[in-house]
Amino acid sequence: MNSLAIIGGGSWGTALAIILAPRFPRVRLWVYEADLAERMRETRENDVYLPGCRLPRHVEVVNQLPAALDGAEIVLSAIPSHLVRGLYQQMLPFLNQSMVFVSATKGLENGTLLRMSEVIRDVLRNRLAPRVAVISGPTFALEVARFEPTALVVASTDATLAEILQGAFSGPTFRLYANSDPIGVEIGGSVKNVVAIGAGVVHGLGLGHNAMAALITRGLAEITRLAVAMGGAAQTLAGLAGLGDLVLTCCGDLSRNRMVGVELAHGRKLEEIVSSMKMVAEGVKTTNAVSDLARRHSVELPIAEQMLQMLQFGISPREAIQRLMDRSLKGESG
């Protein structure tokens, strides 16, 4: 495979263009904002979302979808979850059966509760029989763009496709593991953002390392329960797309979702926090969908439920933590 189209000019899309450019002779990066696209062409830098990281010379920055998709063999989307359906609908006239579609978005669609790979299939199914994969794992865009060692997962129900993409994407500092469980991978990448808000609360309230360890461990138990109920494999959540991503997002200072929790613990209002952010904290948007999925599959997710109560119904961060501590006692597997 020689031609790659990356849809999304945020920090993650830009980082993917930088890290994957050595692997593909032709790379096009679609950027929504025309003025930003023009500056990126001139300066070879995304000064809004990933300043200080230079785009390789042969990465072509475009602002029009037809130009981005023309001749592409792989379409890799790295856009906020709430934009995926609409953008794929816009792209539909320019797509063809030979293309492979890869989602790098971590989130769920509110209302339908679909995972991102399911949204892509839903849009394309009447016209194409799409080959779809997902990439996910513990990845901060800045570290990827700096060529710091990173490992993640590429998952598809088509094991051969996952292995092809593993070979196409892997490089000296970007190691991919093939996986045949997109359900587990996508649920891990989505629900960890909700748990990370709780981790931010723990940090922001100064509750200590014991509390953080408990939050991460019980959060992983919740993610695993939901993924298994939906048909995913428990072992997936013990890997990069589960435990790995959860630890990074809960503990790393670059985590936007963790930052939301920290700021809430410091007394700021959610609306103020979100409006001040350049990039989306997916956990804020995902919390409702996770709660709805839990009810649909009769799975108990107490941490996710308290994050919903805090984000949507206004209970205080300290009360959310205390409610978790006051729950009825049970076995660890419960």
Question: Positions of the model-derived regions?
Answer:
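Internal alpha-helical scaffold of NAD(P)-dependent oxidoreductase catalytic cores
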Residues: 83, 94, 119, 123-131, ...
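Conserved active-site and cofactor/substrate-binding residues in soluble primary-metabolism enzymes
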Residues: 7, 11, 15, 35, ...
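NAD(P)-dependent Rossmann-like dehydrogenase/reductase catalytic/cofactor-binding core
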Residues: 199-203, 228-238, 246-334
